[in-house]
């Protein structure tokens, strides 16, 4: 079920009236659904733009069309038009399922480690242009990672590994006993902090 507030409906209705196209509605879709990059897209949709398999939600003065493939990702979504503390008004979309759901506790340790890396750790490392990839998870719970981007060759990679990544993985994934770095940092060509300046 998708909730669209009265304020958001009024906002959309005014925009559609300004366009002056008979039958125009708003189409909602999920972009890169099930990934950390997932986002919601809203766009005007004329009748000729519709494929016919969209879910139609009747609103006050227009129809909200949800792309069929996006429906599971948009379940529980809330669309609102809010006034921020600065006085500016902004359209907000909260779609709690759009990035996917964490694997169940019964999932393999590899699945749970990969989910935490992709959805919690890599978004933080991205602020420095970095990322990590899971190379291996051993039977005794040792996670082997390979750093990339700005983390490849970074002088602070050891600190990031021990104080950030290892603590996060050990706290979020039962059974993880250690996290090790498999990266040859000497080959990094664009580190966030060069190794010789981190000392």
From Swiss-Prot:
Species for this entry: Xanthomonas euvesicatoria pv. vesicatoria (strain 85-10) (Xanthomonas campestris pv. vesicatoria)
GO biological process: iron-sulfur cluster assembly; protein maturation
InterPro entries per the UniProt record, alphabetical: Fe/S_biogenesis_protein_NfuA, FSCA_dom_sf, HesB-like_dom_sf, NIF_FeS_clus_asmbl_NifU_C
Assembly, per entry: Homodimer.
GO molecular function, one term: iron ion binding
UniProt keyword terms in alphabetical order: 4Fe-4S, Iron, Iron-sulfur, Metal-binding
Protein name in the entry: Fe/S biogenesis protein NfuA
Family of the protein in this entry: Belongs to the NfuA family.
Entry-linked Gene3D superfamilies: Fe-S cluster assembly (FSCA), HesB-like domain
SUPFAM superfamilies per UniProt: Fe-S cluster assembly (FSCA) domain-like, HesB-like domain
UniProt cofactor note: Binds 1 [4Fe-4S] cluster per subunit. The cluster is presumably bound at the interface of two monomers.
Any Pfam family the entry gives: NifU
HAMAP family per the UniProt record, alphabetical: Fe_S_biogen_NfuA
Binding positions ([4Fe-4S] cluster): 151, 154
Lineage: Bacteria, Pseudomonadati, Pseudomonadota, Gammaproteobacteria, Lysobacterales
Source organism superkingdom: Bacteria
Entry cofactors: [4Fe-4S] cluster
Function statement: Involved in iron-sulfur cluster biogenesis. Binds a 4Fe-4S cluster, can transfer this cluster to apoproteins, and thereby intervenes in the maturation of Fe/S proteins. Could also act as a scaffold/chaperone for damaged Fe/S proteins.
């Amino acid at each position: 079920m998708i909730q669209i507030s009265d304020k958001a409906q009024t906002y959309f209705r005014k925009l559609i009236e300004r366009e002056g196209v008979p039958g125009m509605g708003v189409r909602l879709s999920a972009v890169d659904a099930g990934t950390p990059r997932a986002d919601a897209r809203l766009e005007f949709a004329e009748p000729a733009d519709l494929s016919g398999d969209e879910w139609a939600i009747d609103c006050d003065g227009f129809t909200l069309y949800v792309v069929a493939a996006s429906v599971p990702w948009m379940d529980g979504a809330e669309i609102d038009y809010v006034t921020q503390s600065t006085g500016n008004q902004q359209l907000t979309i909260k779609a709690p399922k759009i990035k996917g759901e964490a694997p169940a506790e019964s999932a393999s340790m590899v699945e749970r480690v990969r989910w935490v890396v992709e959805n919690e750790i890599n978004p933080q490392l991205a602020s420095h242009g970095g990322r990590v990839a899971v190379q291996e998870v051993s039977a005794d719970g040792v996670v082997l990672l390979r750093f990339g981007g700005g983390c490849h060759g970074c002088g602070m990679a050891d600190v990031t590994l021990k104080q950030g990544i290892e603590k996060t993985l050990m706290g979020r994934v039962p059974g993880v006993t250690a996290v090790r770095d498999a990266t040859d940092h000497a080959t990094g060509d664009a580190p966030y902090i060069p190794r010789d300046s981190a000392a």
